[in-house]
């Protein structure tokens, strides 16, 4: 609701889309800043989902105060389209859901001294962009080798082995399971 009250069940109900830190002008285009933090550190997970997406969104990773992005490409291609890595490090769920309606995840560590990630492009009216960036900040003075695509290519065998090992792990069942039949839904997990 547009008039949600703190403490009500719908406080800020699903109104968290397209909320960016700021908008910047760069090379004649508007860029929407999603993430900015003190370094050194590493982005360890990015989650994105979209609504009314027109396939024109560009994601740019500016690292170490560079004006040239270390990574640049169409949003879903970068996050879950295997541009940087394969499954399960770059993935989207659920496969039963249409691609643009899925949650898209990238678990590839992107180390930096000073980061900045922008979602750029012309956002048409009605386009909704939901995201979460998880990161780690290291102690001042920690030595971090900033991410480069060249280093990613050099370490392709390590990345392939990691992806393969993760995919070969068995799916563990929970200790407690409850089968719900019919039109019932679990509304309490205690």
Please place each PLM-identified region on the residue numbering.
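Beta-strand-centric surfaces of beta-sandwich/beta-rich domains
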Residues: 1-190
């Amino acid at each position: 609701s547009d008039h949600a009250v703190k403490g009500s069940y719908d406080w800020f109900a699903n109104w968290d889309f397209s909320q960016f830190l700021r908008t910047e002008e760069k090379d004649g285009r508007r860029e929407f800043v999603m993430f900015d933090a003190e370094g050194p550190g590493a982005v360890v997970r990015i989650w994105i989902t979209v609504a009314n997406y027109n396939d024109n969104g560009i994601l740019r990773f500016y690292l170490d105060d560079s004006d040239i992005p270390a990574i640049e490409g169409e949003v879903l291609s970068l996050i879950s389209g295997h541009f940087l890595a394969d499954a399960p490090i770059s993935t989207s769920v659920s496969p039963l859901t249409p691609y643009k309606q899925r949650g898209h995840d990238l678990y590839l560590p992107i180390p930096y001294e000073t980061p900045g990630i922008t979602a750029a492009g012309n956002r048409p009216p009605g386009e909704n962009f939901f995201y979460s960036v998880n990161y780690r900040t290291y102690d001042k003075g920690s030595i971090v080798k900033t991410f480069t695509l060249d280093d990613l290519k050099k370490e392709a065998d390590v990345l392939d082995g990691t992806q393969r090992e993760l995919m070969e792990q068995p799916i563990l069942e929970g200790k407690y399971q409850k089968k719900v039949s019919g039109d019932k839904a679990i509304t309490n997990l205690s």
